[in-house]
Amino acid sequence: MGAVMGTFSSLQTKQRRPSKDIAWWYYQYQRDKIEDDLEMTMVCHRPEGLEQLEAQTNFTKRELQVLYRGFKNECPSGVVNEETFKQIYAQFFPHGDASTYAHYLFNAFDTTQTGSVKFEDFVTALSILLRGTVHEKLRWTFNLYDINKDGYINKEEMMDIVKAIYDMMGKYTYPVLKEDTPRQHVDVFFQKMDKNKDGIVTLDEFLESCQEDDNIMRSLQLFQNVM
């Protein structure tokens, strides 16, 4: 995923190439297109057509090509399993333990619950997280927190996610972190979200609470930065 995010961050630079030599530009485009076609035929899993993914996401075809190259570089087979996903994700958080949060994040990406994440799964989630509406991002976050996928978030699920995030950030990010800080954080947020006090947070309660409380929204945006 490191290569994927790296290539994505450089998209704007690549898109601003000077167009002084049209013939050279056309040659480069045709060469890249041939390379893309060859790449598509050499992997074990061939993703959906880029036109279809372009229609389903907020990325252009060219951006999808760049993202695909990065994904294939990290995952030559065209899919990534949980163990590989954890190894890649751990590289971004060397001072903490990212394994538990990576497990939850992997399950959120693996929408079909097959035990592997395809390029389509990855780019669809990335599209929501980077360019989705506030509503789309909140729905995706709710699904992440709903660990057992029963349509609700209970306090222990929220606690598991928040603690995993604190563990991942490590001691250098939180030098004076007390052991009960995650629990206190969850207690405050859950009390605000569980509006009818039935011990669970529904999607509607989650959406309403997040959009009406700036503190919750800021915290979620902070947590989304580690996705």
Curated annotation (Swiss-Prot):
It comes from the Eukaryota. Pfam families: EF-hand_7 (PF13499), EF-hand_8 (PF13833). Ca(2+) 1 binds at residues 146, 148, 150, 152, 157. Residues 214-227 are annotated as: Interaction with KCND2. It is found in: Cell membrane; Cytoplasm; Cell projection, Dendrite. Its main location: membrane. GO terms for cellular component: cytoplasm; cytoplasmic side of plasma membrane; dendrite; Kv4.3-KChIP1 channel complex; neuronal cell body; potassium channel complex; voltage-gated potassium channel complex. The keyword Transmembrane does not apply. Detected in hippocampus and in the molecular layer of the dentate gyrus (at protein level). Isoform 1 and isoform 2 are predominantly expressed at equal levels in brain. Colocalizes with KCND3 in inhibitory interneurons in cortex and hippocampus and in striatal interneurons. Residues 38-94, 97-132, 133-168, 181-216 form the EF-hand domain. One of its GO terms (biological process) is regulation of potassium ion transmembrane transport. Ca(2+) 2 binds at residues 194, 196, 198, 205. CDD domains: EFh. Keywords: Calcium, Cell membrane, Cell projection, Cytoplasm, Ion channel, Ion transport, Membrane, Metal-binding, Potassium, Potassium channel, Potassium transport, Repeat, Transport, Voltage-gated channel. GO terms for molecular function: calcium ion binding; potassium channel activity; potassium channel regulator activity; protein-containing complex binding; transmembrane transporter binding. It is a peripheral membrane protein. Belongs to the recoverin family. Component of heteromultimeric potassium channels. Identified in potassium channel complexes containing KCND1, KCND2, KCND3, KCNIP1, KCNIP2, KCNIP3, KCNIP4, DPP6 and DPP10. Part of a heterooctamer composed of the tetrameric channel and four KCNIP1 chains. Probably part of a complex consisting of KCNIP1, KCNIP2 isoform 3 and KCND2. Self-associates to form homodimers and homotetramers. Interacts with KCNIP2 isoform 3 in a calcium-dependent manner. Regulatory subunit of Kv4/D (Shal)-type voltage-gated rapidly inactivating A-type potassium channels. Regulates channel density, inactivation kinetics and rate of recovery from inactivation in a calcium-dependent and isoform-specific manner. Modulates KCND2/Kv4.2 currents. In vitro, modulates KCND1/Kv4.1 currents. Increases the presence of KCND2 at the cell surface. This is A-type potassium channel modulatory protein KCNIP1. The gene is Kcnip1.
